[in-house]
Each structure stands twice: as C-alpha cells, then as structure tokens.
UniProtKB/Swiss-Prot annotation:
Mg(2+) binds at N275, D284. NCBIfam families: PRK00029.1. GO terms for molecular function: AMPylase activity; ATP binding; magnesium ion binding. The gene is ydiU. It comes from Burkholderia mallei (strain NCTC 10229). InterPro entries: SelO (IPR003846). This is Protein nucleotidyltransferase YdiU.
Amino acid sequence: MGSNMSFSRSEAAPAAPLPDLAATLAAPRDDAFQQLGAAFVTRLPAAPLPAPYVVGFSDDAARMLGLEPALRDAPGFAELFCGNPTRDWPQASLPYASVYSGHQFGVWAGQLGDGRALTIGELAHDGRRYELQLKGAGRTPYSRMGDGRAVLRSSIREFLCSEAMHHLGIPTTRALAVIGSDQPVVREEIETSAVVTRVAQSFVRFGHFEHFFANDRPEQLRALADHVIERFYPACRDADDPYLALLAEATRRTAELVAQWQAVGFCHGVMNTDNMSILGLTIDYGPFGFIDAFDAKHVCNHSDTQGRYAYRMQPRIAHWNCFCLAQALLPLIGLHRDAPSEDARAERAVEDAHAVLGRFPEQFGPALERAIRAKLGLALEREGDAALANQLLEIMDASHADFTLTFRHLARVSKHDARGDAPVRDLFIDRDAFDRWANLYRARLSEEARDDASRAAAMNRVNPKYVLRNHLAETAIRRAKEKDFSEVERLAAVLRRPFDEQPEHDAYAALPPDWASTLEVSCSS
C-alpha cells in the first residue's frame, strides 16, 4: 500500500525547486492530449487566487509523481498549485481546458467541457505519465453560467475521497493538494474559494467522444480514439478492430469499477456520461457518499429527486453510459475491415457493439460476486453463495444495518457457535432475522478449510473499518473554515490505512451521530 501519508512538515529533504517543476509541467509533449489541437482544448491562464494557502497535501500522491513531500513547504507552492502565474508563459505552454459533451440525468445536454478546471501539464515517474489538473482555477469558455471557482467544502471532500478510494484499492483520480483562499464565492451561502490539484494518467471522458460524434467531426473523433489507444490501450492496436477493442476494454473496466463501488457501499451521485472516465477511473467527486444505514435505494445526491443514480441503479446506469460511448464510436468501428458498402459497415458495427455491450452483465456480475464472496470470507465457490449474500443484504436493508460495520464485524462470527455474533447482531433491528441468516452462514463456513482466525484476517483485508462518512468530512470542513486544518490531515491519515485496526482512531469507525442524518450533499457540493 506504499508509505504512510504524513502531513507534518519535512525536515529531511530540501524543498523541490519550483521553477524547474513549473517548466517541466509546461514542456509540450508530442503525444500529449493538448497536442490534438484547438478543436479539443482552449489555452488560457488561470484566474489569480488572492493570498493562497495550503489546506491539505498528500505525501503519497507526491511520491507517485516523483516529488518530495517537502515540496509543500517550497516558497511559491501554493501559488503554483492554485494557478497563479509564476512566470510569463508562452501561449503554447499555457494551461488548457478541454471541450466535451454528454448526457446529464439521462438527457442530452449538448456541449459541456472543463468549466472550472485547467490542466497545467504532465509529470512522468516510474514509466508512467500523469496529467495535473487544477479544479477551481477560474472561468473557461466552457463555464456556461458558472464562476469557474470551487469552494473549500467541495475541494476538501474531493481531496479526501480521491485518496481514500485509492487506499481502498479502487481505481480513481488522485489528489495532490488543496489550496485555499479567503476569496468569497456565492453558492447557497457565501463560501470561500479553493483549488484541488487532481492527478490522473488521463482525464478523457465518455463525453469527449460524444462531443465529436454529435457534432459530426469524424476526423477529430478518430484522432481522439487513436490518442487513447496509443497512450493507454496499446494492446488494442493489434486487434482486428482497434476501435471495437477500445469499446470492449472501456466497458470491461467500467463494469469492474462499479462492482468495486457496490462492494464498499460507495455512491457516486452524478453518473452523467461526462463524468465517466475512458480509463475506468472514479472521477469527479461531487455529491458522493458512502452508505451508512444500508438502503439499496439510497440516493446520496439531494439534487437527484428521481433517484436515477441511487446505489442499486449504479450498475444499470454504468451499462447505459457504455451504450452512449458505443454510439459515439460507431463511425469508427469496422473501418479496419473491408465492407461492400458504408451501410454494410455501419450495420456490422452496430451488431459488434451490441455484442460487446451484452458482455457487461457477465463482467459486472462475477466481479461483484468475487468481491462479496471475499467480504464474507468464502475462499471456495459454492452454488448458493449469491443467494446467501442477497439474503444478508435484504435483512441489512430491512434493519438499516450499517453497511461498513456489518461486513467488518462479520469477521468475528465463528463457524462453531454464536459467541462472536454480538457486535454484528447488535446492528440489526430484527435480531431473529439475523440469527436465522447467521445459522445459514455458519453452515456455509463449515465447508471452508480455513480456521476462524485465518478467515477473519482475510476478511479484514477487504472489509474496511474506515471510510469517508459524510459526517467525518463535515467535521473536517467546519474546522478548516476556521483555519484549523489539523482534522483534514488527521482524517486523511486514518483513511490512508482503511483496513488496519488503528484502535486510537476507533471514533472514526463509530456509527454516525444523530446530526449526521441532517447532512445533505447536492450538485453544488
């Protein structure tokens, strides 16, 4: 899992030379996304952020980029990573915003784009290249009616969850830093500005492909697909149909990603096609949430009044989004094969795309079943395992048992008797229903060769004790608004080791307080 995250100021290593870092970020690369041209990106400087200061910093993300954690103490760090100019940039090296389109809440929304994010360049380390993007860096041509700013509240949430998801083992964009400022911005109330530095190998979304398809720009569509294949899916180059292979890989990664979400009780909140990564990463942390009291119909986004993106709907929506990606790729599928006519090529492309999309359930289902089987401590595969898991989820739903603690405490259940049942049993309103299920579970455990201790250790490696519950984030945010960033640092450090006991931090694993039920997050989050 890498080295421990630390937010203490480092005395051991010298601060990184920021001018060299800035120059490296700005250096153009022939195969970088921005080299695709003006149809894809608009270059512009970030809007200056007055008197910036560091709110949070991830040592772990810094090391991934080949940077020393001492970088956060370098003079000018906050200025560089909020987008304030540190030098006179030539036009060819300016940050850029990209254009894309997409479906929002199932409706075609037309042109969207990076409305408040600017990509400032790339860093390479350990054979991988990463794009760095500043979210909240000011207005762009794609801001629509927005002011281009992010607020401290949402930036802290994205920072914490990006890193938490990584340490849960779930593919995600990363977050290097949060930079704050006292500059006021108007949302439901007056808040202050912030910028979060997001990191990913690519920020290309399904919506990028939809944009060029919808605007009938086949050359740009093909250039985009070729870029993604060349940089991120090189095995697709040798396929009989590289573009069909791209669709297949993106669909598979999406199915497996959502299975991982479901396994930890994560709700994204706004699974629009412009929020879907072509690399199968969790991207765009807004009104997300980890389920506390289990409810399969749980909706974490207060703006989602119809429940389109409810927990139970996420697999179906992900599949639907892959259909949107497939539609955008249809003009490319089959171009490498001989066809008697364009109509014949197009007809075959539809058939091939449907075949790829038809595999989504058989990719998602087994991925989730494997994850749940591991969460239940079942090393062997048996025919009734899915039914056993579904019965557990049903009684959890009926009792609104805490999702994270239920699976964590199941490790204490013995295959021999009920003496270890109490911690998990106490989470259920209907104790009789739990007892009936526990007897079935014990019977199933008796078929396993592992002893209780070995099974419990394995379960604790996949069932986190700590997740980013909304009330934990809210506490850190409230303190940060008072310029006390210690809780952001402390919470991030706890979430860095989600599977470890960390008994000194038991309070972070407790059931949410009553006031947590009043918290709401929405698209403005």
